[in-house]
Amino acid sequence: MGNQAGNNNETRDLLVGIDAGTSVIKAVAFDLSGRQIAVASVPNRYTTSADGAATQSLDQTWTDCAQTLRDLGAKVDGLAQRTRALAVTGQGDGTWLVGAGNKPAGDAWLWLDARAANTVRGLQEGPASRARFEATGTGLAACNQSAQIAHMAATMPDLLARAEVALHCKDWLYLNLTGVRATDPSEASFTYGNFRTRRYDDAVIEALGLSAQRRLLPEIIDGTQITHPLSADAATATGLLAGTPVCLGFVDIVLTALGAGIHTEGAAGASCSIVGSTGMHMRAMRNEDVHLNAEGTGYVIALPVPGMSAQVQSNMAATLNVDWVLNLATDLLKQFGTTLSHGERIKCIDGWLQSGRPGSLLYHPYISDAGERGPFVDPNARADFIGLTSESRYPDLFRAVVEGLGMAARDCYTSMGIPMPDELRLTGGATRSRALRGVLGAVVGAPTRISTREEAGAAGAAMMAAVALGVYPDMDACIAEWVTPLLGQAEAPDAELTQLYAQLFPAYRKAREALVPTWDETARLLKSRYRPNALSAGLN
């Protein structure tokens, strides 16, 4: 067989999922039933600057991806010969321009890049803005590739002139793996198309002022139906066999949700929240049942299930708030010559949550310099405590911060215009704390459930490959084996706390609406002082 993939599926018992995130690039091996075998990772690298730029080297990203696959091969005996398929997903939004010879036209603009903010304001004021939102289901922000290309067209026409195709992160890796320029239905439709058809929409492209740039948009392929073979060059770079089928996954946010249980049989009322640096709150919906809010915020992202999408609202900062309040304690202790390791701080979380007084304070978790993006968009929004007294102590502050994360999640789910979750499936590092899960469940008013799945994004990508290769007849059959058995027991929220938080939520909502003029005035007062441009909202 040499360095070519053969057709003996009896020995090809593994699927490999790649998740190229903003923080880490991972390659994960799974057996065909979904059991995780091994994982390899390298830190992702990008640069930021005071003008709001956040950029990443395309060549370095491919080098790092190939390195994770070689490292995975060092951990798994016979990985190359055993790999039945490779699947790739990655960070969403952003712009990865490729020119002649499939070489980078420049560094990638990430979802973090804020330079298109003024262009977004102009597009939002256009007469076709609402029609664009109703087609894509997605609020326009500086993170979106469409906004970034519109900004480039106005300010950097030479860059676009060098480009032959505009890709996303996973698409760039797929190009390097297969030599095929393509994107997936999820990012194509929420950026330039219609989530109902999963195709490009010329009216949307025209509303964005990008008809002249239509040439940059690649072919759309559905990775549950189409794969391409690993190229000889990619085989040399990764240590895998040329000809191995490669699957282009959907964007990592919905594949993470898929692996964590957003869509399982008999659980139509369940929702999924990813509690990471940001908060992603979503419900799997039939396309005809999606509700588009009057504010024009959020995302509607196609799922790799026919006729289904994830209706998404995302708040800018989730565990960033917890990091901030933990750092308050750490910094104070340093003044007295005491240090706390990250692990020691994490061990304190449950104790502080238990000793803090429930509902004694209100906290709005807008700790990011970029303000808030969901369920409302305001770059001037800032965090605050309401209700401080001389009796307030650090555990009260800490508990209020976690309650604030729950309030933000409830705010997001309320704004979707659909029934509140009857079960909340949680993923993200912070949800390992049972006490924290208890607070989130009580604030949202739903039982919580977590999965033992460690690498949900890579698993979601591998699941797409499993369906594409016929290991399973459809995604529902794959979910039944890869996802459902890994879900833990439902944890019911405390009834008394649920009632308390239900009474407090209207005050939380009214307070954040009343604070808008204060945020604006504060921003004006600070304008004369040097502050780096805040980073833009987007999918990470």
Locations of the language-model features?
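A generic structural motif
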Residues: 43-45, 111, 211
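Active-site core segments that coordinate phosphate-bearing ligands/cofactors
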Residues: 2-6, 16-17, 124-136, 147-182, ...
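N-terminal glycine/serine-rich phosphate-binding loop of ATP-dependent small-molecule kinases
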Residues: 1-107, 235-236, 240-248, 444-448, ...
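Short beta-strand-loop/turn "lid" adjacent to the catalytic site in phosphate-handling enzymes
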Residues: 76-111, 139-143, 174-194, 219-224
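A conserved helix-loop-beta module that forms one wall/lid of the active-site cleft
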Residues: 209-221
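Residue-level signal for inorganic ion chemistry
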Residues: 34, 57, 86, 113, ...
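Structural signal for short hydrophobic segments within the conserved structured cores
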Residues: 38-42, 218, 489
